[in-house]
A protein has these predicted regions:
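Hydrophobic beta-strand anchors of alpha/beta hydrolase catalytic cores
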Residues: 48-49, 81, 128
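Short, internal strand/loop/helix patches
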Residues: 96-131
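A short beta-strand-turn-helix
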Residues: 25-46
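Short pre-active-site segment immediately N-terminal to redox-active cysteine/selenocysteine motifs
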Residues: 44-47, 51-55, 124
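Boundary of Sec targeting at the N-terminus
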Residues: 16-19
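Thiol-/selenol-based redox modules, centered on thioredoxin-like
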Residues: 129-158
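Sec-dependent N-terminal signal peptides
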Residues: 4-13
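Structural microenvironment flanking redox-active thiols in thiol-disulfide oxidoreductases
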Residues: 61-101, 115-116
Length: 158
């Protein structure tokens, strides 16, 4: 009985701790407007929102490391990476040239006014948010070499 009660409290606490994605509209690099809540809402699909900037070396290393596994992960885990650039109006012009050189397969969104960053209370980058069925199920701040393995294990557990 005690174990059952503890399990219910734990599961209830986890469910309560999940935050919904905010309804924020951003532009893609092709100038198309998308809403992060409604346009990334396929049932049971996992969305990895990776917040980054052109001036952030760890951010670029993280996106490069994920890219090495992306084709396999996206098939195996039914997941998609959405790279959200927080470059402001001064540095946003560097995003497209960097993307042209990297050839990342990700959807890239521009948060130049940092509306999504603020709505999610993100202090600094790199910052990764995992969303499933509209709820934020995991967050991670920072990147160290090999961090993609931790990300993969987290994705597998979902």
């Amino acid at each position: 009985m005690k174990k059952t009660l503890l399990l219910l409290l734990l599961v209830g606490g986890l469910a309560y701790g999940q935050k919904e994605m905010p309804s924020v509209s951003l532009k893609t690099t092709e100038n198309k407007t998308v809403n992060v809540k409604t346009d990334f809402a396929e049932k049971d699909k996992i969305y990895v929102f990776a917040f980054w900037a052109t001036w952030c070396t760890p951010c670029i290393k993280e996106l490069e490391a994920i890219n090495e596994h992306y084709a396999d992960w996206s098939k195996e885990l039914n997941m998609e990476v959405v790279a959200v650039s927080i470059d402001d109006s001064r540095t946003e012009k560097r995003v497209k040239p960097l993307l042209n050189g990297k050839k990342w397969p990700y959807t890239v969104l521009l948060d130049s006014n940092q509306n999504l960053k603020r709505a999610l209370s993100i202090a600094n980058v790199p910052y990764t948010i995992i969303v499933k069925n509209g709820a934020v199920v995991h967050v991670h701040n920072g990147y160290n070499q090999g961090g993609e393995t931790e990300l993969y294990n987290t994705l597998k557990s979902l």
